[in-house]
A protein has these predicted regions:
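Active-site region of glycoside hydrolase catalytic domains
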Residues: 50, 56-212
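Substrate-binding cleft and catalytic face of glycoside hydrolase catalytic domains
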Residues: 1-90
């Protein structure tokens, strides 16, 4: 990681903490270097093309990134939390078909084998963080379930990453924000946008109300 870029990340972390908040630092959208290059050998990439990659090299890169990040922030207190990834798909390429392990919307079907791959990526982060010492020895580290989808919690629960620090120093992360409530801006022919949440509807407008 470019040192000046990491300095800018540190400046933002400092602003967050100085304002009395907790900062969560993760590798957010990664342009696919982590998600698309996790298999050893030949596979289909995000653009639907055949490609060959080395999963062990990706794990080394994950560990290398987090070694650099962890050393930069090892003296920070518990107000700084690390997160191993963001919404890890493990070769979650779009535009496929309902064949050869792909669902009808083009996502690679996630199973226990792919959870093992994701687990190893999380463990690469955990090793790097713990080995850096300082407050990172017991810093809280967030690990995500596949795609951070709550209905895939069992896959993470059944194959949870091993933390060298022991138990009690990691958190599981799920994302749940209904598309109609958080991203849509107008009604469509196939669905209505949600303007209200449950009993906050000012009147009888059930069609535009999200019920949790």
């Amino acid at each position: 990681i470019n040192s000046s870029w990491l300095d800018s990340v540190k400046a933002v972390v400092d602003m967050v903490i100085d304002n009395g908040m907790y900062a969560v630092l993760n590798s957010h959208w990664d342009n696919g270097w982590l998600e698309d290059k996790v298999f050893s050998g030949s596979h289909i990439d995000r653009d639907g093309k055949q490609t060959t990659t080395d999963s062990s090299a990706v794990r080394k890169l994950q560990e290398g990134y987090w070694t650099q990040i962890a050393n930069k922030f090892k003296d920070y207190d518990e107000k700084l939390i690390f997160a191993s990834a963001n919404e890890p798909g493990v070769n979650d390429h779009r535009g496929g078909s309902a064949t050869d392990g792909y669902t009808d919307n083009g996502q690679l079907a996630f199973n226990a084998d792919r959870m093992v791959i994701l687990k190893r990526l999380h463990e690469a982060c955990l090793r790097a963080v713990r080995n850096s010492g300082g407050n990172n020895a017991t810093r809280t580290v967030i690990v995500q379930m596949p795609r951070t989808e709550i209905d895939k919690m069992a896959l993470l629960q059944n194959d949870y990453p091993t933390d060298p620090a022991g138990t009690g120093y990691t958190m599981a992360e799920a994302h749940f924000y209904p598309y109609q409530l958080t991203l849509m801006t107008q009604d469509e022919s196939w669905v209505k946008v949600f303007y209200y949440w449950e009993d906050l509807t000012p009147g009888n407008d059930a069609a535009h109300t999200c019920s949790g």
